[in-house]
Amino acid sequence: MRSTLVTGLIAGLLSQQAAAHATFQALWVDGADYGSQCARVPPSNSPVTDVTSNAMRCNTGTSPVAKKCPVKAGSTVTVEMHQQANDRSCSSEAIGGAHYGPVLVYMSKVSDAASADGSSGWFKIFEDTWAKKPSSSSGDDDFWGVKDLNSCCGKMQVKIPSDIPAGDYLLRAEVIALHTAASAGGAQLYMTCYQISVTGGGSATPATVSFPGAYKSSDPGILVDIHSAMSTYVAPGPAVYSGGSSKKAGSGCVGCESTCKVGSGPTGTASAVPVASTSAAAGGGGGGGSGGCSVAKYQQCGGTGYTGCTSCASGSTCSAVSPPYYSQCV
C-alpha cells in the first residue's frame, strides 16, 4: 500500500513537472500573426540542461522549416510561448510550475535562414530579467521575465535593431527557468529559433558569441538559488546590443503583448523556400526525400494551425499524435 502511494506521488510530481514545460512556438510581426510558419518548433516541450551541447543553438531535435517571416529593421516582433503545442489560449500560464527566470532574445546573421545550423555568431537584442520586489523574502517573490510572459498570455515584444544589415537571420527566443538552479546542471533552458528575412537596416556589425560557449554552468545567472533572498541578478551571456532593448521585470504588458489576440487581427504570410532535408540543430533527425522540403523524424508535420512542411524524411511518415492538434514524423 505504501509502495503504491509513493509511486502515485512520484508519478503525480513528474506529470506536474512535465506540464510546466513549454516552447516558444508563434511569432507576431508588427502586430500581424504569423503563427508557427517560420518557427523551428521543438518536438518536445522539455528543456535543455547541458549548456555545452549544440542543442543550445535552437533546441533538441529541431530542423529548418519551409518558410521565412519578413521583418523590417527597426520594427517589433513578438515571440509567443505556451506549454503545449498549438495551444495558444490564455487559460494556462505560458510556463507554469514557478519556473521563474529571465527571457532573452538573440539574433544570428546567416546566408540562408532555411538551412543555417546556428553555428554562426549570436548577438543579444533583448532581455527581461529580474527586479527586486519591495519587502520580498526570496527570489521567488521578486519580479521576473517569466512572470511578465505569464501575465501577457505568453507574449514578449522585442525590437529588431534598426541598424543591422538586411538579409536572413535566425531569431532565438529563450527562457531560463531557475527553480532548480541552486545546483550545477539544474537550470532549465527553453529556446526556439525563428527564420526571418530582414529588409532595410544599415551596416552595423554587432559583436557576437557562440552557442555553445556563451554560457557556463557556473555563471551566476545559471547557478543561482532563487529560493533565498536576492540582491542582484545578472543574466548570462553578453550585454544587450546597443541597438536592441530591455524590459524591466514587473513593468506590465505593452504593445502587442496586450493587444494582439489570436483570430481577431491581421495575419501574415511567410515566404516559402526550399528546405534542405538535413537537420540544422544538434539532436535533429536526418535523411530526407528528394526535392522540396522534408521534415526530420520526430518533428511536427501537421496539426491545427500548422503551415510548414508536411513531407517526412525517408524512413518516417506523418502521423497524428494528438489529433487534430499535432502530427509528427515517426
UniProtKB/Swiss-Prot annotation:
Catalysed conversion reaction: [(1->4)-beta-D-glucosyl]n+m + reduced acceptor + O2 = 4-dehydro-beta-D-glucosyl-[(1->4)-beta-D-glucosyl]n-1 + [(1->4)-beta-D-glucosyl]m + acceptor + H2O
Cofactor note: Binds 1 copper ion per subunit.
Primary localization: secreted
Gene3D superfamilies: 2.70.50.70
Keyword annotations: Carbohydrate metabolism, Cellulose degradation, Copper, Disulfide bond, Metal-binding, Monooxygenase, Oxidoreductase, Polysaccharide degradation, Secreted, Signal
Cofactor: Cu(2+)
Binding site for O2: H179, Q188
Domain characteristics, as noted in the entry: Has a modular structure: an endo-beta-1,4-glucanase catalytic module at the N-terminus, a linker rich in serines and threonines, and a C-terminal carbohydrate-binding module (CBM). The CBM domain is essential for binding to and subsequent oxidative degradation of polysaccharide substrate.
Protein name: AA9 family lytic polysaccharide monooxygenase E
Organism of origin: Neurospora crassa (strain ATCC 24698 / 74-OR23-1A / CBS 708.71 / DSM 1257 / FGSC 987)
